[in-house]
Amino acid sequence: MKTSEWIDISQPLNNNIATWPGDTPFSYEVSWSKEESGSVNVGKLTMSIHTGTHIDAPFHFDNDGKKVLDLDVQVYVGPARIIDVSNLESIGKKELESFHLEGVERLLLRTSSHGKAEEFPEVIPHLRADIASFLSEKGIRLIGVDVPSVDPLDDKELAAHHQLFKHGIHILENVVLDHVADGDYELIALPLALTDADGSPVRAVIRPI
């Protein structure tokens, strides 16, 4: 593979994609066809912000937290490292201490725990709150996971969410990493310019560096 080739690590958005139980189902339809308009097809999109590959803003879990447009877009573009943390129920400082993370600003975790975008998982590996201070000490500003949340699916406290942003670490969820190797990449995962939103879908892509 040429180093200039970008690799998509996003979940494709279509009407079969799984959503959080009780959340807004994804729907795309052509609401105004070329035959009707005489010139173009116009589509209509209905979705939850937390469908597919997306970022969380602090407003998602804190009424006083920053919204998407307040976030530093520089965090979502730049060098990233992918590491494998498969076969773990949870991930914290202990599990990451053996990895060389000096100089890493963006870290993507491959758990390989759930690869079906059409089925919402029942259980996922989650991040423990102690990971936040550890990542911060390493200089990491973004953490990405290949599951819908950094916290357990049924958790209401969202300790990992809170601690990560408390330590200045941004959250990227539902990336697709099973088709890429461990190593260093350039990442682009820019959120939309949504003024008042608690998160945003992203088109996440990487290329080897």
From Swiss-Prot:
Binding site for Zn(2+) 2: 56, 161, 173
Keyword field: Hydrolase, Metal-binding, Tryptophan catabolism, Zinc
Pathway: Amino-acid degradation; L-tryptophan degradation via kynurenine pathway; L-kynurenine from L-tryptophan: step 2/2
Coiled coil (UniProt feature): none
Positions of substrate binding: 20
Entry cofactors: Zn(2+)
Sample GO molecular function, one term: arylformamidase activity
GO biological process, one term: anthranilate metabolic process
Record: residues binding Zn(2+) 1: 50, 54, 56, 173
Manner of cofactor binding, per the entry note: Binds 2 zinc ions per subunit.
Catalytic residues (UniProt): 60 (proton donor/acceptor)
EC category name: hydrolase
Quaternary context: Homodimer.
Protein family according to the UniProt entry: Belongs to the Cyclase 1 superfamily. KynB family.
Name by which UniProt lists this protein: Kynurenine formamidase
